């Protein structure tokens, strides 16, 4: 019998992820977890390429390295199918609301910020969140400054101190072949001419495609936490400027840690034939 989310993760999802790796990858490597302390909670901020696997495969790596699994943010737009909702709730996922008017948006951001801080600081539970709203479709991984500002919303006193309390850890994920590349390219091509309207069932199709299709080599690299020492030089800046600098620090960490694949080299050669 399974009675807790942790048991579900260890007895079901861990083996499910192993089977996904066996069937659809040629290699999975996660580096950097040795720099983290198993007893310390972290806020993992990751570039986002796959709806489910970016966070789910990290869970396996955490277990293998002797860490506790983390809670996972999941967009409300994905919590529409009953099966997805059930699996999400059983897998330490929590719903992130998007949209609404300015007041509703602010209240949602404040609620999310408070929950993340409560999870990390008060309960000692690590959390995973993507660096931006939605997956990267053009290969340009950029952290939204608004995300960092959201982290700081729930802090009291010095905002940089409140950010340091979250133990932000940038994570770089890299797939040799992105399972949803054709779907992403089609969406980008259509969006170039008119606003893209997502069709019913499209997110579920992307989840299934991402899990089932070949990925080749998969590489994750966990980087050093952004602690008080790293954030201290920003103390003299206004909040908005400090937030932008923190977002850039996350970007630089992810880009430096990103494992380039032959597909990246081929794409660059096509874009820059003169070099």
Regions found by a protein language model. Give the residues of each.
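Membrane-anchoring hydrophobic helices of lipid-metabolizing enzymes
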Residues: 1-42, 48-59, 63, 85, ...
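Short, flexible loop/turn elements at secondary-structure junctions
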Residues: 34, 46-50, 76-78, 97-100, ...
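Glycine-rich, often proline-containing surface loops adjacent to acidic residues and nearby aromatics
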Residues: 37-41, 89-96, 125-132, 221
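A short alpha->loop->secondary-structure connector
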Residues: 62-72
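Conserved nucleotide-cofactor-binding alpha/beta core module
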Residues: 71-102, 106-107
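Non-catalytic C-terminal accessory region of glycerolipid acyltransferases
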Residues: 105-275
